[in-house]
Amino acid sequence: MKKIVLAFSGGLDTSFCVPYLIDKGFEVHTIFVNTGGITKNIEKQISNKSKKLGAKKHHSVNVETKLWQQILTPLIWSGSLYQGKYPVLCSDRYLIVSEAVNLCKKLKTNLIAHGCTGMGNDQVRFDMSIKALGNYEIVSPIREIQAKVSDVRNYEIDFLKGRGHKISSSNSKYSINENLMGVTISGSEIDKWQEPKDQTYVLCNKPNKYLSLIHI
């Protein structure tokens, strides 16, 4: 059985990837790379979820200091903002790939998987970083099913429920990425270019709920 390293966040996409890859005949080793923004309790929940999904072994690595030193500090110095609006917080993907590749070396495998879809920039960040670090074979389960079905999230939910796995309501609706630099949220009405509902906000309120400034 071939070993494969899966970059694992515990969200819907990467949760789907675990049993999907097992069905394909892989021995799945998950790795969660902590780039900040989560508690120890959540990190433990992610580990437990990986094991319940059937991963052979779960690995957790903390790179908060690396993120601060290698990415966040240079971004602050340069004043660089994504589309002139917010820090490129998804640049933590490069550190995630680096740690996943390190695990590949330890396990003596060249197989690496991620849960990126085929419609965003994350797939480019992951794929190009992996290719830059060596001769690794990339397995992308979400892109594979996107070629066959149109409603990917519901397909993933049905797939997991069919194998007895519970799905939280937030997982089923939104994909949330959080680290030291901020939060990105996608899915549901957001992907349809509609205004997100109040419960989607993680670190702040909607602008119309901001406190009014008092001028003296």
Q: What do these predicted ranges mean?
A:
Residues M1-I214:
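Nucleotide-activated chemistry modules centered on ATP-dependent adenylation/adenylyltransferase
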